[in-house]
Amino acid sequence: MKNRHNGFNIFWDRAGMLLVFAVLFTVCSFTVDGFFSRVNMEGLLLSVSSIGIIACTMLFCLAAGAFDLSVGSVVACAGVVSAVVMNRTGSVAFGIGAGLGLGLLVGLINGVLIARAGINALIATLATMQIVRGFGYIVSDGKAVGITQDSFFVLGNSSFAGLPTPVWICLVCFAVFGFLIERTTFGRNTLALGGNPEAARLAGIPTDRLKTIIFTLQGGIAGLAGIVLASRFTSGQPTVAQGLELDVIAACVLGGVSLTGGVGKMSYVIAGVLIMGTVRNAMNLLNVPTFYQYIASGLILLTAVGFDRLKQRGSGR
C-alpha cells in the first residue's frame, strides 16, 4: 500500500499538473464552441508566449528562493527603448540590442541589490518595477512609439511550420532553460540555494554571484519578451504588461514550482502556463466580462499558493 502511495506521489510530482491541463483542455474542447479550432489554438499559443518566455527564468528566481516583480515594467520599457532607438538610428539590430541591454541592466541591478546589498527581493524588485515603468513613460512621453522599420515586425508577426514566431521563441526558451535547470551544475546549484542557502554556501557554491546571474538572466529574458511584444504590436507601448509579473509567478507556482525555493522543473512551468492560458481563452470565448476575469485571475493565484502550501506540508518543509 505504501509503495502504491509513493508511486502515485512520484507520478503526480512528474506529470500531475500536465494531466490536469489535459483534462481541462479536453473538457473545453467539447463544451466551448470554437475552442479547438485552428485559429483559436494559434491564438491560445500566441497569448501565452510572453508569459511562457518570462516564466522560464522566473523558474530560476523562485527555485533560488526569490522572485522578480519588475518583469512587467521591463517588458514595457524594453519595447519602448527598442522602438525609440530603432527610429533614431534606422537600425533594427541597434534597437533590439538596446532593449536587451536595458533588460540585462535592470536584472543586474536587481541582483546586486538582493545578493550584494542584502535587500529583500520583494522590496528591491518592487522599487525597480516603479522606476523602470516611470522611465518607460518618460522616454515615450506617455504615448505609444510607432516603429518605422518594417523588417522588425517579422519577429512578432511571422510564422514557421504553422506556428507563430513568438511561440517558437517560447519553445526554444523552454528547451534551453529546461536543460539548464535539470541537467547542469548551474541548475543544481540554483535548487540547492533555494533549498538551504546556508548549506549551499558551506558547500562552496558562490551564492551571491549565482543570485546576481539569475536576476540578470531574468532581466534579459524580460527584455526579449518586451521586444517580441513590441514587434507584435508594431509599436513600443509603456502601458503594456501591467500585472504580468503576477501572471508569470502564478503560472509557475500553479504548475508546482515552490514559492519557498528548492523545487522546480520546466514541466511544472509548461503545465502552469498552459492551464492559465486555457482558462483565460475559454473565458474569452464564453464572453465572460473582464471584471469577472479579474476575479478568476485572483482565484487562480490563490489556488496556486494553496497548492504550494499543501505540497510543503506534505513534504514536511
For each feature predicted by the language model, list its residue ranges.
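Inter-helical junctions in multi-pass inner-membrane proteins, predominant
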Residues: 33-43, 136-142, 180-187, 214-251, ...
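Single transmembrane alpha-helix segments in multi-pass membrane proteins
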Residues: 23-88, 112-119, 256-266, 299
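Helix-loop-helix "hairpin" substructures at the membrane interface of multi-pass membrane proteins
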Residues: 91-99, 105-110, 114, 161-236
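Cytosolic-side transmembrane-helix boundaries in multi-pass membrane proteins
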Residues: 1-26, 30, 202-209, 281-317
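Transmembrane alpha-helical segments in multi-pass inner-membrane proteins
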Residues: 216, 222, 232-297
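Hydrophobic alpha-helical segments embedded in the membrane of multi-pass proteins
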Residues: 48-57, 73-77, 104-108, 171, ...
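Short loop segments and helix-boundary regions at transmembrane helix junctions
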Residues: 2-8, 67, 104-145, 183-185, ...
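Transmembrane helix-bundle core of multi-pass membrane transporters
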Residues: 117, 121-184, 210-213, 232-241, ...
